[in-house]
Amino acid sequence: MSMTKINWYPGHMKKTKDMIKENMPLIDIVLEVVDARIPLSSKNPDIPKFAKNKKRIIVINKADLVTKEEINFWKKFFKENNFADEVLELSAETGFNMRALYSIIDKVSAEKKARLMAKGLRKVNTRLMIAGIPNVGKSRLINRIVGKNSAGVGNKPGFTRGKQWIRIKEGLELLDTPGILWPKFESEEVGMNLAITGAIKDEILPIDDVACRLLDKMMEMNMKNILKEKYKLLDEDFDQVTGAIIESIANRMNMRQKGNTLNVQQATYTVLRDYRNGKLGKFGLDRDLAETMINDYK
């Protein structure tokens, strides 16, 4: 599949990019949210370009959807390659490890306050920007930080519209930004990983190809047994191309439509939805990119 089929950079993303650049001089801390299943593919390479000389925190969200070993690999990777000042895993959905994030934010805020008050300033505000790609969990994270539903929450890419300044507490303000991708993905694999995890709208995707690529990856990781158990597949179902395996899933799960024909589209969306919801096991998709793509993201 060519990259052009899965690029998604509508006009509002260009406007958001310009807005982020415009507001960056006001910001003290840039908190970039990435998806634990695709920490590198979900890391917008434009953010470091905008955030030079800022305190940078990478939050690996959705940590509950991968193994601890996977998390440790990416924390070490980001730290050793100087991607950020701090790297932290959490789950905005469950609240896991939120206290650690609060501590980091408070520490950076206190450092700025002490520095400026030593110069005679009496009132010091710290401003935090939350940035990331669509559907990575920014709004849920903000709700955790603020403690109320001030940002709204959606489970589709592109939910948050326009910038939002949110007062967290005295002396600490947060700028929420809509999720943005970038004009051209560095590789076909990056685009495909974004599509598999739901960062790109399904409506514009060659969805059959996306589901097939997910199954290919699961085969490469020897995860056939999970598919067998989840979808009642037999060994013989795997002696065929992945497109036919999806047909077998429709057959074994009795997914049928008018005329009693197999509903392959239902099977396709079911496989993707199950992975996105963590029902096909805890695993990531990005390991192969760690060495080959590193310079594109720093």
Language model: regions and residue ranges:
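Helix-rich effector regions associated with P-loop NTPase G domains
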Residues: 1-29, 37-38, 43, 50, ...
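Glycine-rich phosphate-binding P-loop
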Residues: 127-147, 151, 177
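Conserved active-site beta-strand-loop modules that form the wall/rim of enzyme catalytic pockets
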Residues: 92, 142, 172-175
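Structural beta-sheet core signal
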Residues: 32, 58-60, 130
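Short, structured loop/turn "capping" segments at alpha-beta junctions
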Residues: 112-116, 143, 149-155, 221-226
